[in-house]
């Protein structure tokens, strides 16, 4: 029996619902911090990395239907990518406009276990939910307005879907998260923070859209343009890049690269 992946529609004998979400984090600027010093009075090298968690808060949501605390997430809409769904769903469920950071990981569990505390079944013969997770950070409302045309509409979730949103410490989230799989994602988030993810900047490398074949192009290679198919690819790329809220775009001087960015 072969599973068929889809965006929430029944297809074949086994249904795999694709979904996406994120661990939304922020700094608690009101926290005064803990002093971590060695015996000689100098701050230890490990203290600076551990101190990241002193001021760090993550966002969890309560779903009244299941009476559970979980990460903001949701199913993909028709023709939607996981990246776009992650940003849209987190923004809709928390009311906070966000941008994606590093990819964290994925979880999978039978749909029948939705809302249950333990979700570790690997039965491939039952309907399944498959979820990808990223790190995400809040962005300014002005940035959200600026990217709105590229990203598309975001509609706040109603109270019947999400009735409470809380910012809590990592330690508190570990206690409050209802599901074992969500705690697995939290562990991956902690690993990324310990690796220095909060101190890094996002760099995206993007290939140009489909260009005219070299064998058919009679001009110089730097003037070889994108095709109508390439223009369509470039247009759809706009929505994907908006998920990361880039602040600067740099392109090669070659025409096909410039056309990809300009679309």
Can you annotate each of these PLM segments?
Residues 2-71, 203-208:
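N-terminal strand-loop-strand
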Residues 15-17, 53, 126-129, 160, ...:
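A generic fold-level signal
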Residues 66, 106, 212:
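Active-site loop signature of alpha/beta-hydrolase-fold enzymes
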Residues 70-74, 113-116, 215-220:
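Short acidic, glycine/proline-rich loop/turn micro-motifs
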Residues 72-73, 80, 251-253:
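Short His-Asn-centered micro-motif
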Residues 76-179:
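Unchanged
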Residues 168-197:
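Short, structured interface segments
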Residues 200-263:
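Active-site-proximal alpha-helix that buttresses catalytic centers in soluble enzyme cores
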């Amino acid at each position: 029996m072969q599973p068929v992946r889809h965006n929430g529609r029944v297809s074949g004998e086994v249904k795999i619902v694709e979904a996406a979400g994120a661990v939304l984090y922020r700094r608690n600027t009101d926290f005064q911090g803990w002093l971590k010093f060695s015996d000689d009075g100098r701050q230890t090298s490990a203290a600076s990395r551990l101190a990241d968690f002193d001021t760090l808060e993550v966002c969890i949501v309560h779903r009244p239907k299941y009476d559970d605390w979980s990460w903001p997430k949701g199913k993909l809409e028709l023709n939607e990518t996981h990246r776009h769904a992650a940003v849209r769903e987190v923004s809709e469920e928390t009311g906070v406009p966000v941008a994606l950071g590093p990819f964290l990981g994925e979880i999978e569990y039978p749909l029948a276990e939705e809302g249950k505390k333990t979700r570790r079944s690997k039965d491939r013969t039952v309907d399944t939910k498959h979820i990808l997770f990223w790190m995400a950070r809040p962005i300014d409302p002005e940035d959200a307005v600026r990217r709105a045309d590229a990203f598309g509409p975001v509609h706040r979730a109603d109270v019947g879907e999400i009735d409470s949103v809380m910012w809590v410490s990592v330690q508190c989230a570990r206690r409050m998260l209802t599901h074992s799989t969500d705690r697995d994602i939290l562990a991956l988030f902690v690993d990324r923070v310990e690796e220095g993810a909060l101190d890094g900047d996002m760099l995206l490398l993007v290939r140009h859209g489909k260009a005219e074949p070299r064998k058919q192009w009679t001009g110089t290679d730097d003037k070889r343009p994108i095709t109508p198919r390439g223009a369509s690819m470039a247009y759809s790329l706009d929505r994907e890049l908006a998920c990361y809220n880039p602040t600067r775009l740099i392109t090669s001087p070659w025409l096909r690269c410039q056309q990809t960015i300009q679309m």
